[in-house]
Structures are given as structure tokens and as C-alpha cells.
Amino acid sequence: MTINIEYEAEEKLDLDYEKIITDVVNEAVDYEKCPYEAEVNVTIVDSESIHEINKEYRNIDSPTDVLSFPGVNYVTPSDFDAIEDELENNAEDYFNPDTGELLLGDIVLCVQKIKEQADKYGHSEKRELAFLTAHSMMHLFGYDHMTPEESAVMEAKQNEVLERLGITR
């Protein structure tokens, strides 16, 4: 498992963000029973940078807390059996040629939103960072929250990942 973490924001988080991100990513991969060694890229940026990325990729002209860019197109969330042929027949599109790891995708986190939302929701910055990472990992596994049913499934999964790590409000 490779987790590449880049911290590009000037404003710092006063916590061990690398450990928190690594623990959550590893737990999510284990929880979703990913059958491959995997790679995830995580970048921590400021509000201005995530605003630009959000505008460019989602046509939303405002900053956000986290953006997810899945590397795999699932038929059904986290159903690797359903896409096994696609992965094997197009390995160059899905696997890192140097490591052989499945490219699960990219996560972009906003440092200011982590701080603001931790304060707003009355919990620690550690919990907010862990929550946003778990949320984004579920997107990398193909889950979404466009309907109430999808939201309920995704929320239960991300909360279970956090509970397994002992990270609570």
C-alpha cells in the first residue's frame, strides 16, 4: 500500500496528519476488502487552491472541504469482481507500472475547512481530518450521496471506519 501525502498549504495543522490519513486510508482499504495492493494520493491545500480545483473540475465557484478523484469506474461500489476483466484487460489504465498497485485515486483536503468544520461541529481537528479522509475514501470506492439511500450507506461505512480506529466526536 502506497499513500503519497503532499502538504501544499502554508497554514499548518497542529496534529500528526500523516498518521491520521495513513490510518484511515489503510482501514478503509481493509474495510472495503480491496483485493489489490493499492495507491492513494492525498494533497492538503488552502482554500484558494481547492476553490480553483473545484471550479475547474466541478464547475462550482467556491471552496469545499474535500475533493475526491476516483481512479476506478465501478459498476457497483467496491465490487471488484464486476470489474475484474476491465482491470486486467486495461491494466495500464488502472495500475502503477512501477509498483503494480491499483491506482484508487486522489484526495484533496482543505486545511482551513478542516479547522472551520471542527470548530463548527464541536469536535477535534483530528476527527474532522479523519472524517473527511474516510468520506473521500468511500468516494474512491465508488460510493456517493446523491440520494438519501446512497447517503445512508456511505455514512454508515465512513462511520464504521472511524469507529474501528476509535476516532469519535
Curated annotation (Swiss-Prot):
Listed InterPro entries: MetalPrtase_cat_dom_sf_prd, YbeY
A cellular component annotation (GO) from this entry: cytoplasm
Subcellular location: Cytoplasm
One Gene Ontology biological process: rRNA processing
GO molecular function: metalloendopeptidase activity; RNA endonuclease activity; zinc ion binding
Pfam families reported in the protein's UniProt record: YbeY
SUPFAM superfamilies associated with the record: Metalloproteases ('zincins'), catalytic domain (SSF55486)
Record has rRNA processing as a keyword: yes
Cofactor(s) in the UniProt record: Zn(2+)
UniProt keyword terms in alphabetical order: Cytoplasm, Endonuclease, Hydrolase, Metal-binding, Nuclease, Ribosome biogenesis, rRNA processing, Zinc
First-level EC class: hydrolase
PANTHER family: ENDORIBONUCLEASE YBEY, CHLOROPLASTIC
Family recorded in the similarity comment: Belongs to the endoribonuclease YbeY family.
Its biological purpose: Single strand-specific metallo-endoribonuclease involved in late-stage 70S ribosome quality control and in maturation of the 3' terminus of the 16S rRNA.
Name of the protein this chain belongs to: Endoribonuclease YbeY
Organism: Lachnospira eligens (strain ATCC 27750 / DSM 3376 / VPI C15-48 / C15-B4) (Eubacterium eligens)
